[in-house]
Amino acid sequence: VSETPGTPPVTAVNVTRLLAEAASKSGVLWVEVPDGSGAPETHAVWFVWHDDEDPRGTGPAAYVVSGEGEQHLPDLPAEVTTIFRSKDTGGRLLRLRATVRVLEGGTPEWDAAAEVLRAERLNATGDVVARWREGATIRVLSPHGRPDEAPGTYAGESGRRPVSPARGTTTRWRPWHWRGRGRG
């Protein structure tokens, strides 16, 4: 517990345990990508948390699949900021830097990651692994370092951003009770 005069006491947080619990209990995280203007572009992504428990491996990481028929995710730089949410409240819990690796198709590592993702993919139709092999990208996001935000150290702003226009968020037809059809 650390105390500064005039501020409430802050209890030390075991970030490793908190990350493992938050990542294993949630299926969505946010990825912040620099957009060139200085303001980050934030993408909500479905992921699977996986730890191969191999001491020679990369350690626990978030596996993300994107591409045709899957979630949209732009090309990611070598390092991004990830925001993990609390399963209980849905609010941000941890904000960490993460290294990004793109897995090469046809490698044993890609095949293993595809199987981990396939097992957790809801409402999958057909052979998703074959579809991913044709046109999807599998990335491994490995969080590291001290968190930018954690319990007791949150930034003051809310983090709200307008929804980016996309096929899933843009409405063309609205029901009449939502100011959609003309009255006449």
Name what the model sees in each region.
Residues 1-28, 160, 164-165, 172-174, ...:
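Extreme N-terminal tail/first-helix region
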Residues 15-17, 42, 69, 126-127:
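A generic local structural motif
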Residues 19-20, 70-74, 114, 129:
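Short amphipathic alpha-helical segments and helix-helix/interface helices
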